[in-house]
């Protein structure tokens, strides 16, 4: 059976960076499930299709190629806004969850990060992590990331956006953001990326040892 690591958490908590490091460490396949919603939204926008037609959005979601998700292209703010509109559609979520589960079966192992991996997509994952940080810390990270990339950023606007996204993610009727009961909580507010990685690695190593 494939070894699955589920990493959930709110926006800008550091789960993407952590997931990529873990996947690299163990030679596992990595999927940022948030990009699957963004890819669906971009496909709709590129085709000039409406973002409020659930049947059309579901059909588009079923045609998304998970092997060709380009983080740089899909990180555009307008795509993120569109993705948040289709992400609340149950039919779209069902279609993408099916694709994400199929990805999770890849050998020798997979790391999936998102909002509902440990609770909905892969409830039987060998390791479940819930990565979080205070809204202030997450907004500062996002702000610094944009500035480092040569962009202009307004901390207050980003902070408000982080809080808005938290409310939307946690208040969603279908698959709300919450830690799985058996998830290990990693608060990265005061943690470096390296410290978070080492904490996660300890948990993964222990689970791998149990599997053997």
From Swiss-Prot:
Gene3D superfamilies: P-loop containing nucleotide triphosphate hydrolases. Transmembrane segments: none annotated. Coiled coil: none annotated. Its EC number is 2.7.4.25. It is found in: Cytoplasm. GO terms for cellular component: cytoplasm. CDD domains: CMPK. One of its GO terms (molecular function) is ATP binding. It catalyses: CMP + ATP = CDP + ADP; dCMP + ATP = dCDP + ADP. One of its GO terms (biological process) is pyrimidine nucleotide metabolic process. The keyword Oxidoreductase does not apply. It is an enzyme of class 2 (transferase). ATP binds at residues 9-17. It holds the Pfam family Cytidylate_kin. It comes from the Bacteria. Keywords: ATP-binding, Cytoplasm, Kinase, Nucleotide-binding, Transferase. HAMAP family: Cytidyl_kinase_type1. Belongs to the cytidylate kinase family. Type 1 subfamily. This is Cytidylate kinase. It comes from Rhizobium meliloti (strain 1021) (Ensifer meliloti). The lineage of its organism: Bacteria, Pseudomonadati, Pseudomonadota, Alphaproteobacteria, Hyphomicrobiales.
